[in-house]
């Protein structure tokens, strides 16, 4: 509920917050707010669930994770960065660049050879990246919308979106920010999607 609260208390108010829950029970301590729409699911889509209810969405789209404390100006900054790129790019706070050369074909190559731009670290520019972390991502629907139907594996949603963007010819960029502009909430490590991929 803390990430949801941080997104509902933004300097630039959001119109709607769609929460996909990989369970049949509503999470405890969610705030009561008419902008919050909760979708429960018997099927566990893992992090792909961020895209389960996106069809038909118009306007600015920001995807989020439940373990991040979003700063008060997060939505305002992200929308500003989308506009800086003329609504023609995906922007994010966490991302990675892949090496040039032969294609990366194994998970071990991906984890060892990529150059990560971690969301808690200061970043001075609008660096182009190959992959954006979908917990810190924004774009405009004019680019189109990634479809959950095209995501054939779980816990790899960042890679699915990167492939979608590459096929659409959509660029991805990091945003400039100060150190610890965003932080993580404490959570048991085994509950994290990233830990489940190891």
Model features per residue range: what roles?
Residues 58-69:
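Short beta-strand-to-loop acidic/aromatic patch adjacent to the donor-nucleotide binding site
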Residues 1-3, 24, 52, 82-85, ...:
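Catalytic phosphate/metal-binding cores of nucleic-acid and nucleotide-processing enzymes, i.e., regions
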Residues 141, 146-198:
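C-terminal catalytic/acceptor-binding lobe
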Residues 69-149:
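Conserved catalytic core of nucleotide-sugar-dependent glycosyltransferases
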Residues 18-59:
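Active-site-proximal specificity loops/subdomain of glycosyltransferases
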Residues 15-16, 60, 171:
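Residues at the starts of beta-strands that form the adenosine-phosphate
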Residues 1, 24-29, 100-101:
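Short, charged/polar "capping" segments at the starts of alpha-helices
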Residues 2-15:
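Short, acidic, metal-binding catalytic loop of nucleotide-sugar glycosyltransferases
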